[in-house]
Amino acid sequence: MSLFFLWLVTYYVGTLGTHTEIKRVAEEKVTLPCHHQLGLPEKDTLDIEWLLTDNEGNQKVVITYSSRHVYNNLTEEQKGRVAFASNFLAGDASLQIEPLKPSDEGRYTCKVKNSGRYVWSHVILKVLVRPSKPKCELEGEPTEGSDLTLQCESASGTKPIVYYWQRIREKEGEDEHLPPKSRIDYNNPGRVLLQNLTMASSGLYQCTAGNEAGKESCVVRVTVQYVQSIGMVAGAVTGIVAGALLIFLLIWLLIRRKSKERYEEEDRPNEIREDAEAPRARLVKPSSSSSGSRSSRSGSSSTRSTGNSASRSQRTLSSEAAPQPGLATQAYSLIGPEVRGSEPKKAHHTTLTKAETTLSTMPSQSRAFQTV
């Protein structure tokens, strides 16, 4: 009974074969093992077949040997990349794939048949993809006292991808660890929060993204700025603008003042005083033969003008006496007002006597006013 049970277990194992799991990186070469002892007695009846069941459950034939022929171009995806690794007739029916692609991942089955005997072996192939080069970014303003987030992410690669941040030592004595007040987001390991930035936080930071296939990294520089320096720059710019405006205003005022003074100087000679008093009399050249009589007429006219009203005096003073032509002497005398449109009349002896009497009786102040 025990011998029968041992034979049954041996037959079951030999029939179903073993399960093997292999991990390889994409673009590399892999060999899937499959060994048998069924080809030595009778080689003409030997059949070898490799099958692939992908992650979606679809099954396809990869390579076969039958009737002394090898068929290895059965699928378009693996055409020219699959072959038997060794002498399959001697008992090594291992499959070789080069180069590997992510689509090669799945469950491979090696089936060997000869004269009614079967050997099965199963290999689970996992194709690992290296992380793509991550992209390092900064979120926030790198100013003193603020918080800054370092972001790192790979677009492709076999999960899980592990991210690791560190500082790059640029000078002797610099620490490679992150600043003390740094927090890692465990829900998103590619994010690191730098809290309460100081000038010591400035430097070069490196992010490394890695998995079982390999790793890639990126770097980003953090330069912490003083908040005061930003305020000083803003104040300096404001001061420059205000100074420029002030200078422009002063220049404009000076130009305006000069223009006003020039305008006043040009208009000053043309001013006319409206309150100036009109001339009372005009000197003319009388003839020598009638100088005595004109003096008498002048005195008589002055006497008559004294008794007239103020309006007639103004009209009389504005009149002008025309000079007499053909005079030989150069003597001058005061002439009185003339009535428009009429010749001055000669004073009578009686009239002159009355005028002299009137002048003698007038106060001295009045006489002085009349003789002006």
Swiss-Prot record:
Residues 263-280 have a biased composition (Basic and acidic residues). Residues 18-126, 134-223 form the Ig-like C2-type domain. GO terms for biological process: digestive tract development; postsynaptic modulation of chemical synaptic transmission. Residues 256-372 are cytoplasmic. Residues 287-313, 352-361 have a biased composition (Low complexity). Residues 362-372 have a biased composition (Polar residues). Residues 18-234 are extracellular. Pfam families: Ig_3, V-set. Gene3D superfamilies: Immunoglobulins. It is found in: Cell junction, Tight junction; Cell membrane. PROSITE patterns: IG_LIKE (PS50835). The chain crosses the membrane at residues 235-255. One of its GO terms (cellular component) is postsynaptic membrane. Disulfide bonds join 34-110, 152-207. Predominantly expressed in the white adipose tissue. Induction: Up-regulated in mature adipocytes and adipocyte tissue of obese animals. Keywords: Cell junction, Cell membrane, Disulfide bond, Glycoprotein, Immunoglobulin domain, Membrane, Repeat, Signal, Tight junction, Transmembrane, Transmembrane helix. Residues 1-17 form the signal peptide. InterPro entries: CLMP (IPR042454), Ig-like_dom (IPR007110), Ig-like_dom_sf (IPR036179), Ig-like_fold (IPR013783), Ig_sub (IPR003599), Ig_sub2 (IPR003598), Ig_V-set (IPR013106). It comes from the Eukaryota. Glycans are attached at residues 73, 196. It is a single-pass type I membrane protein. Residues 263-372 are annotated as: Disordered. May be involved in the cell-cell adhesion. May play a role in adipocyte differentiation and development of obesity. Is required for normal small intestine development. PANTHER family: CXADR-LIKE MEMBRANE PROTEIN (PTHR44783:SF1). This is CXADR-like membrane protein. It comes from Rattus norvegicus.
